[in-house]
Regions:
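RecB-family 4Fe-4S metal-dependent nuclease core
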Residues: 1-222
């Protein structure tokens, strides 16, 4: 973890234990505990100027271009990145962001979720990162994520002629909260359907591309 939202900083210490406590999601109205595991590629953190709030960004590195889409989250797909982000920000995991003195932050809030992948080289042959995702529309957060003013690591955001930032990657705190609700609803609905015996296949180019049993499934993707 870094003490800023600058991905050029040092990563977390491999000798430390950063295991997350799971966020419980109840399926239907039964006492069914859903445990979803995974490994986060990168976590960046920023201690706000108020001294009480920690903001978190998660970064998922991809070998090829990968677009962030709110629609895919609403369609119960592509939820992994947001699941990491909101699990990190849950009260159960606040101890991960304790100060050296042991003091815990009053709040741990989501700042950004980013897919990063290599893109075409520029004219000088340097590899340019391709990034998509969301970032909180807050000057303090944007400045922390963009300390050298290059916009290299801001997802789908650009600086306008007036000096302000624009782009589809910007979102406010209310939309972040809405995304968390959408995410938990998607997980809950999918789990409830599975426990009720419904396990219909949902073919798509993305869902079936790496499936190990697609040859025997009978699904035809055009």
């Amino acid at each position: 973890m870094t003490l800023s939202l600058d991905p050029d900083g040092d990563g977390y210490d491999d000798d430390e234990d950063y295991s997350l406590l799971p966020t419980r999601v109840d399926a239907d109205r039964r006492a069914v505990k859903l445990l979803l595991g995974g490994r986060i590629d990168r976590v960046d953190m920023y201690r706000a100027e108020d001294g009480e709030t920690v903001y978190v960004r998660v970064v998922d590195y991809k070998s090829s271009k990968h677009d962030f889409s709110v629609k895919s989250v609403k369609d119960d797909m592509n939820i992994q990145l947001l699941l990491y982000l909101f699990t990190l920000c849950s009260p159960e995991n606040r101890a991960l962001f304790a100060e050296e003195s042991g003091g815990l932050p009053t709040r741990v809030l989501p700042a950004s979720a980013v897919y990063m992948s290599p893109d075409e080289s520029d004219r000088m042959g340097a590899l340019l990162p391709c990034r998509t995702g969301i970032v909180l529309e807050d000057p303090e957060i944007i400045n922390a994520a963009n300390p050298d003013d290059t916009q290299t690591y801001l997802p789908s955001v650009r600086r306008g002629k007036d000096g302000g930032f624009t782009g589809k990657g910007l979102c406010n705190a209310a939309f972040m909260a809405e995304l968390e609700t959408i995410l938990h609803t998607a997980i809950r609905d999918t789990a409830a359907a599975m426990y009720s015996g419904c396990a219909d296949r949902t073919p798509s180019d993305d869902a079936c591309k790496y499936c190990r049993i697609k040859a025997s499934c009978g699904v035809s993707i055009t």
